[in-house]
Amino acid sequence: MTVAEVIERFDLPQILRHNARFDYEKLLWLQGEYARELGDDRFYELAVHAFAKAAVNTNSFPLHYVKAALDTCKGKFKMFSELPAYAGFYFTDKIEYNAEAAKKDFAPENKPRLQKLRDAFAAAPKFDAATLEAALKETAKALGVKAGVLVHPCRLAVTGNTAGPSLYHLLEVLGKEKVMVRIERALTNF
C-alpha cells in the first residue's frame, strides 16, 4: 500500500479515544479459536503435551483411542491446560465424583432411572453415539421424564463431572465395558 493510499483510507473518527488495554477474556476467546482451527496432528501433539504436564499418561492407551477421545474435545475448551481436567476421565479408571453434583444427580429417585438406563445400554445392538442417544431417549420416554433427567446422572457416573464432551460420543469412545463398570460403580456407591 502506498502512502497516498494510506492517506486516502485514513479516517480519524475510526480511531478509538481510549488507550489500548489488555483484555484477558478476549485472549482466552482467541486462544480457543486458535485451538479449534489447529490441524489434527498439531492439536493431538499439544493435547498430549498438556496431559503429560498434568502427569496423565496417554502413552499406555492405543493411539486410535487417544485420538478419538481428543476429537470429542475439539472446540470445547479455551486453553490446553484445561484439557486434563476436562477429559482426564478417558485415561483413568479412578473416577472422582464432583461432590455437589453427586448430591443432586445421585439422588435416591435417580438410582432406579440409572439402572434402567444401564440396562438399555447393555441391550443396545451397537454401542455408537446414535444408538446410545436413541436408547437414552427411549428410556426417558418410558420413565415419563425428560432426557436431561437421565443425561446428568449418566454423565456424572461415567466422567465424574457435570460438563464435558458430548455424552453420546464420549460413551462411544469409552466403550461398552468401561461405561457399564462406571455406571455400576456409581449405582453401588450411591
Which residues does each PLM region occupy?
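C-terminal accessory/binding modules appended to enzymatic or scaffolding proteins
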Residues: 102-158
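Catalytic adenosine-cofactor/nucleotide-binding cores of aminoacyl-tRNA synthetases and other
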Residues: 1-100, 104, 159-190
